[in-house]
Regions:
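Active-site-adjacent helix/loop segment of glycosyltransferases
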Residues: 198, 202-273
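Conserved donor NDP-sugar-binding/catalytic core segment of glycosyltransferases
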Residues: 92-128
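A short, conserved alpha-helix in the catalytic core of glycosyltransferases
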Residues: 162-164, 170-189, 193-221
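Glycine-rich, basic loop-to-helix element that forms the pyrophosphate-binding segment
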Residues: 61-79, 100
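A conserved acidic beta->alpha catalytic loop
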Residues: 23, 39-48, 64, 94
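Short, flexible, basic/aromatic active-site loop/helix in glycosyltransferases
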Residues: 133-169
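Short, acidic, metal-binding catalytic loop of nucleotide-sugar glycosyltransferases
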Residues: 22-32
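Short aromatic/hydrophobic "clamp" motif used to bind/position activated sugar donors
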Residues: 84
Length: 273
């Protein structure tokens, strides 16, 4: 029988995490499942709250903030289920979503991973999938994101068409991503050089390198509230993003990496090594 481990990595997001856990508990998946929380040394009382309020949830407490990639890797290694569903702590899981994701991936042996449609608190869909990250695709994705945020009619129409159709993008967001555990291990898990950002794009690239593909499944919807811990530490978040961006280009686009460094240095945004 298919089973799934639901993994949530958290850092100082106690309120969002408890809302996420409550959303799962309100309509538990019928698929045999286990929920695992990886706490990255939070100082907001998260470990105690999980132990006290969610005794059925397994808590993995790190002694330091190891980041999203390394936190997920630890949980994936320790899981014993066929599937692993990675969730951000700032998501709300709707009834039937976990079962639908397990069914979608389980029914398609050519797919290595799948992601649902992500929507914000206002119900607007997010751009939670895309082409392989590179200089031109990044420019296109960022321009599209800005136009969509401004509710530019052409951008809104294009995004709304894309989020309604199942397709095979190069990546889906790590905010909610389901993968077969065996495939995750075969791909080498997440590259833990990425503390925050780009790890999902890199992971999907590793999964695709075996000849498999990634699924976007719009029939399943998950709410993504977008991280409080990141909003509280915008400078740290920006540095983490830039470090991951540089690491990604050094790995996947080494000819472009020096140009990226020059660009970031001119902007005063080049992170320390």
């Amino acid at each position: 029988m298919r089973d799934v481990t639901i993994v949530i990595v958290t850092f100082n997001t106690r309120q969002e995490l408890e809302a996420c856990l409550a959303s799962i508990a309100a309509a538990p998946p019928t698929t045999p499942h286990r929920v695992v929380v990886v706490d990255n040394a939070s100082s907001d009382g998260t470990p105690g709250a999980v132990a006290r309020n969610w005794p059925a949830v397994r808590l993995i407490a790190s002694d330091r903030n190891v980041g999203f990639a390394a936190g997920n890797n630890r949980a994936i290694r320790e899981a014993d289920s066929e599937f692993v569903l990675l969730l951000n702590s700032d998501t709300l899981v709707r009834a039937g979503a976990v079962d639908a994701l397990v069914q979608a991936l389980g029914a398609d042996p050519g797919a290595a991973a799948a992601g649902p449609r992500l929507v914000g608190a206002d119900g607007r869909p997010e751009i939670s999938f895309g082409s392989m990250m590179g200089p031109f695709s990044e420019l296109r994705q960022k321009a599209l994101g800005r136009l969509y945020a401004r509710r530019t009619p052409a951008a809104v129409a294009w995004i709304e068409r894309q989020v309604r159709r199942p397709h095979r993008p190069d990546w889906v967001s790590g905010a909610c991503l389901i993968v077969r555990r065996a495939d995750a291990l075969a791909a080498g898990l997440f590259d833990d050089r990425y503390f925050l950002y780009a790890e999902d794009v890199d992971f999907c690239a590793a999964l695709r390198s075996s000849g498999r593909y990634i699924l976007f499944t719009p029939a399943t919807e998950v709410v993504h509230l977008r991280g409080a811990s990141r909003r509280q530490r915008p400078a740290e978040t920006e540095r983490a993003y830039r470090r991951s961006q540089v690491a990604f280009y050094e790995k996947h686009h080494p000819r472009w990496a020096p140009l990226l460094r020059v660009y970031l240095r001119l902007r005063g945004a080049l992170p320390e090594a």
